[in-house]
Amino acid sequence: MAVQKNRKTRSKRGMRRSHDALTTAALSVDATSGETHLRHNVTAEGYYRGQKVINK
């Protein structure tokens, strides 16, 4: 079992956790429908960069 020999300080703990922060999703508004969607992804209506790419 891995058990540490010495206690880690609050500073070292914080440095380790510095990369754990979450970022917000990059959202865009579609020009044709005005729908909010993830960047570089097709909208629910099937539009990508203003063009219809998927027919439902």
Curated annotation (Swiss-Prot):
Q: Name one GO molecular function term.
A: structural constituent of ribosome
Classify the source by domain of life: Bacteria
| Disordered as annotated region, ranges | 1-28
Q: Does the keyword Ribosomal protein apply?
A: yes
Cellular component (GO) terms are: large ribosomal subunit
Any one GO BP annotation for this protein = translation
Output compositional bias ranges, type Basic residues.
1-16
- Which of UniProt's keywords are assigned here? Ribonucleoprotein, Ribosomal protein
Which Pfam family, giving just one, matches this sequence?
Ribosomal_L32p
InterPro entries given in the database record: Ribosomal_bL32 (IPR002677), Ribosomal_bL32_bact (IPR044957), Ribosomal_zn-bd (IPR011332)
Q: Which family does it belong to?
A: Belongs to the bacterial ribosomal protein bL32 family.
What is this protein identified as?
Large ribosomal subunit protein bL32
